[in-house]
Amino acid sequence: CDRRFSRSDELTRHIRIHTGQKPFQCRICMRNFSRSDHLTTHIRTHTGEKPFACDICGR
């Protein structure tokens, strides 16, 4: 494709779209992800962790 990037890590992440590569695997359910931050967010579905709270109401 014609996409260009200023950083090599952005290119690496983009290439995964074309190749379908998903190198990050959840150890609990074995689901695979192309990005580590997506895996981190997914793991919270297993742990129930909710690290962000509203400053106004505390929920």
Curated annotation (Swiss-Prot):
The record marks R3, R7, R13, R31, R35, R59 as: Interaction with DNA. A zinc finger (C2H2-type) spans 1-18, 24-46, 52-59. GO terms for biological process: cellular response to interleukin-8; circadian regulation of gene expression; interleukin-1-mediated signaling pathway; positive regulation of DNA-templated transcription; positive regulation of transcription by RNA polymerase II; regulation of protein sumoylation; transcription by RNA polymerase II. It comes from the Eukaryota. Coiled coil: none annotated. One of its GO terms (cellular component) is cytoplasm. Disulfide bonds: none annotated. One of its GO terms (molecular function) is RNA polymerase II cis-regulatory region sequence-specific DNA binding. Keywords: Activator, Biological rhythms, Cytoplasm, DNA-binding, Metal-binding, Nucleus, Repeat, Transcription, Transcription regulation, Zinc, Zinc-finger. Its main location: nucleus. It is found in: Nucleus; Cytoplasm. PROSITE patterns: ZINC_FINGER_C2H2_1, ZINC_FINGER_C2H2_2. Transcriptional regulator. Recognizes and binds to the DNA sequence 5'-GCG(T/G)GGGCG-3'(EGR-site) in the promoter region of target genes. Binds double-stranded target DNA, irrespective of the cytosine methylation status. Regulates the transcription of numerous target genes, and thereby plays an important role in regulating the response to growth factors, DNA damage, and ischemia. Plays a role in the regulation of cell survival, proliferation and cell death. Mediates responses to ischemia and hypoxia; regulates the expression of proteins that are involved in inflammatory processes. PANTHER family: EARLY GROWTH RESPONSE PROTEIN 1, KRUEPPEL-LIKE TRANSCRIPTION FACTOR. Belongs to the EGR C2H2-type zinc-finger protein family. Binds to DNA motifs with the sequence 5'-GCG(T/G)GGGCG-3' via its C2H2-type zinc fingers. The first, most N-terminal zinc finger binds to the 3'-GCG motif, the middle zinc finger interacts with the central TGG motif, and the C-terminal zinc finger binds to the 5'-GCG motif. Binds double-stranded target DNA, irrespective of the cytosine methylation status. Has reduced affinity for target DNA where the cytosines have been oxidized to 5-hydroxymethylcytosine. Does not bind target DNA where the cytosines have been oxidized to 5-formylcytosine or 5-carboxylcytosine. This is Early growth response protein 1. The lineage of its organism: Eukaryota, Metazoa, Chordata, Craniata, Vertebrata.
